[in-house]
Amino acid sequence: MTHWFHRNPLKATAPVSFNYYGVVTGPSASKICNDLRSSRARLLELFTDLSCNPEMMKNAADSYFSLLQGFINSLDESTQESKLRYIQNFKWTDTLQGQVPSAQQDAVFELISMGFNVALWHTKYASRLAGKENITEDEAKEVHRSLKIAAGIFKHLKESHIPKLITPAEKGRDLESRLIEAYVIQCQAEAQEVTIARAIELKHAPGLIAALAYETANFYQKADHTLSSLEPAYSAKWRKYLHLKMCFYTAYAYCYHGETLLASDKCGEAIRSLQEAEKLYAKAEALCKEYGETKGPGPTVKPSGHLFFRKLGNLVKNTLEKCQRENGFIYFQKIPTEAPQLELKANYGLVEPIPFEFPPTSAQWTPETLAAFDLTKRPKDDSTKPKPEEEVKPVKEPDIKPQKDTGCYIS
């Protein structure tokens, strides 16, 4: 599915040295600081490494997060926070407002922001894998799984960690509830697209495909609605994508619902359902053009050029013509003026996020190691704060060249 999924840019961050001169008083504390620095740098490198796979990402993320936990949680597993939580200032950009970074002197902010990027990496990995010329069944399962993992990470951040921030997220920033919720829903919707493609490939009952398409369209509508109160200057492009996907999958739902109605000898209603599918497909085509002309973060994808998109247009046209022929020869039923109400509920194939937890605190953290950080020796002019003029360079993401479109479904 090359050029099928819209992706916002990765978050960028200022370098962190983890050098605490005077504060670090022993070799074990010094080693932890060195390991934090190197594991953070390694994780940031992997975000743009095309050879990285989910196992490599998990290992690198766990390595960094388990060390970072010592800056957040107390070692005795009480509710008390670590004395080091506020020792370091972290600076991150946002996916929609990438040029203007946010900074917080809080290790929880770092945990959330880096976790957010790990989730984004999973969505980009899924998109890249889905764009392969001849995708295998195992690869399709990996696309499906990666999107569910991403949804689980976003959900966990929203429910368990963002509420712990001392400084609440500013409006329109990634950690604000509207944005992170939109990311959760989009991941679920895109994973369900894989399910729909699989159901079509295996020729499942039209009623099931219609219900899955309708549920997926509702996901996209919900995500779009979640972003509706954001500033259009940075949300318009993303919203166009969500809107066009909503129209596309509603058209799918009406198309397959029409087949179900025809099989039940309700030919007049089937024709009206397919007419609605035709109208929504045309609207999705128009929205594809508008999406391409809308400025905003992220590269522009081209869904209307994808064979999966065009195949629906042909399917709607052929099924409508078939229904009209049947009605002219056999049924002679009146065509309703109103489109049928879609009250479809899928009993199978609905996507739930894969639950996510950060790794426990690294075994390198011991009471002796923690004691080797002496905050009373911290310099008064705190050098851990980034200088005001320090620039956060955007992440240079690799260009993904679209491969030849074979029209293969993700199966």
From Swiss-Prot:
Tell me which domain of life the UniProt entry assigns to the organism this sequence originates from: Eukaryota
Q: Which GO terms describe its cellular component?
A: nuclear envelope; nuclear membrane
Principal subcellular localization:
nucleus
Compartments annotated for it: namely: Nucleus membrane
> Any idea where the BRO1 domain is?
90-408
Q: Lipid (S-farnesyl cysteine) linked to which residue positions?
A: C408
The record describes its post-translational modification as: Farnesylation is required for nuclear envelope localization.
Q: How does it sit in the membrane?
A: Lipid-anchor
Residues with N6-acetyllysine modification: K283
Query: Which residues make up the pro-peptide?
Result: 409-411
Annotated GO biological processes are: mitotic nuclear membrane reassembly
For the keyword Membrane, the answer is: yes
Q: What's this protein's family per the entry? A: Belongs to the BROX family.
The entry's function note states: Nuclear envelope-associated factor that is involved in the nuclear envelope ruptures during interphase (NERDI) repair, where it is locally recruited by CHMP5 and reduces cytoskeletal stress through its action on SYN2 to help reseal the ruptured membrane.
Oligomeric form and interacting partners: Monomer. Interacts with CHMP4B. Interacts with CHMP5: this interaction allows the recruitment of BROX to cellular membranes. Interacts with SYN2; this interaction promotes SYN2 ubiquitination and facilitates the relaxation of mechanical stress imposed by compressive actin fibers at the rupture site.
**What is the protein name given in its UniProt record?**
BRO1 domain-containing protein BROX
Q: Which organism is it from?
A: Pongo abelii
Gene name, Swiss-Prot/TrEMBL: BROX
